[in-house]
Amino acid sequence: SAASDVYKRQALGLYLFINLIFIVKYGLRVSPLVVILGIVLFLTLVLGIFKLYNNRFVDKNIVWLLLIFAVFSYCLTLFVPLESLNVDRWQIITCFCNAVENGEYPYLSHPENIPENLPGPSPFYFVLSYPFYKLNFFEGIPLAASFLWYFCLPFKSRKNRVLTTLLLLISPVYIYEIMVRSTIITNSLIILIWATYFVRFGRWNASTVFFNALLFGMLLNTRNVFIIPVLIYGVYYVCRKQTQMKILWWSFVSIIFFLSLYALLAAVWGVENVLEYNPFRVQSEMIIPAWLSVTIVFIAVVAGAFVKKSENIVFYSCLIFFISAFSTYLWTSFHDESFSYAYLEHFDITYFLFSYTFALYLIKPEICIKVRL
């Protein structure tokens, strides 16, 4: 349909835009020439994939390409020591897990060199990260994304699976995630996997809804921003009478499991600590103001009411993730009184990666044909 083609083109546009702003921001730290070369190389690779993704050799050896990419990327990380990184997500995971093992309240922990940087993610984020912490293998978190993408996401065709996997592997943003041992693409990919299976909600029975709610209650307990696709899905299904009781049952179970880890924190370290230091407070005070969070939530609710087909929910989630990141950038720019300073120095552009993951999934082979023409 015409609307579907618009979604696909916009998804491709977001994919290109987010990669380009990474190239410009980090390339300028070296020289303008690096920016130009980076843009030319990236766009050349994209056009090359548009022509070659359907090649029989590529299709037959895609798993080998994944393995080679993983080994090569891991070798590159050996030249970038953890201690040299300004990105502190691995430090936050380390501090949180160290605090728990030492019997200290984890949301008061912080890196020694950044005392004001308290943990922002929700508890289950650290549960998922714990095996990598114990192995001291933080590279494994972003490296897992390419395998999750290829083996776990549902696609309508193998061509689509191969195309988007290749576009992921050549993305500067994904290589950046691996080099700095970040977690955003992997975390948002897990939510995307859940979201793409959740479109079957209307056909599920009560027990299936229960187990999905249990799973989602834990997944929502990774990052608060993932409330965006939940609200869109929830409002979409509430507007359909045949699923209203299911969505109420699902919501109740999800909330119970979402709150369970906070209840555990309160039982061990006291209600006062949990109320005073928690992810909601950290994110509202250190990242964006509460009024902006409420505005984004409202937009997500309104979007859910306008969705016509469940298949389009991924696009609306992608769009509102982007609006959330861009509005945060604008707020930071006004606070800094400089758009360029906020972009180049202050604002964390990795917030755009939540949108990036959903946008990449929406890119289809037929769009590549039109671009080639």
Predicted regions: what is each one?
Residues F126-L128, T165-S188:
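Aromatic- and kink-enriched transmembrane "portal" helix at the membrane-lumen/periplasm boundary
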Residues I18-I23, K246-T332:
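Membrane-lumen/periplasm interface segments of specific transmembrane helices
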Residues P229-I255:
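Perimembrane helix-loop-helix junctions
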Residues Q10, T165, F198-G217:
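Short hydrophobic alpha-helices at membrane interfaces in multi-pass membrane enzymes
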Residues S1-Y7:
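Short, small-residue-biased leader/transition segments that mark boundaries at the very start
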Residues F138-V162:
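Transmembrane-helix motifs of polytopic, lipid-linked glycan transferases
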Residues L65-E139:
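Intramembrane catalytic core of multi-pass membrane enzymes that act on lipidic substrates
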